[in-house]
Curated annotation (Swiss-Prot):
It comes from Bacillus cereus (strain ATCC 14579 / DSM 31 / CCUG 7414 / JCM 2152 / NBRC 15305 / NCIMB 9373 / NCTC 2599 / NRRL B-3711). One of its GO terms (biological process) is translation. Belongs to the bacterial ribosomal protein bL34 family. The keyword Ribosomal protein applies. Keywords: Ribonucleoprotein, Ribosomal protein. One of its GO terms (molecular function) is structural constituent of ribosome. Residues 1-44 are annotated as: Disordered. This is Large ribosomal subunit protein bL34. Residues 1-19, 31-44 have a biased composition (Basic residues). The gene is rpmH. The keyword Secreted does not apply.
Amino acid sequence: MKRTYQPNKRKRSKVHGFRSRMSTANGRKVLAARRRKGRKVLSA
């Protein structure tokens, strides 16, 4: 059985990237929450 995590840069940024987070209202909420918490990295 193959492992569940098969790294792929393009898919990673499409799903978890900054642009994809900015494209939806809830994604912007995620970024706001991470800024409020003081995360060094906001998105993938």
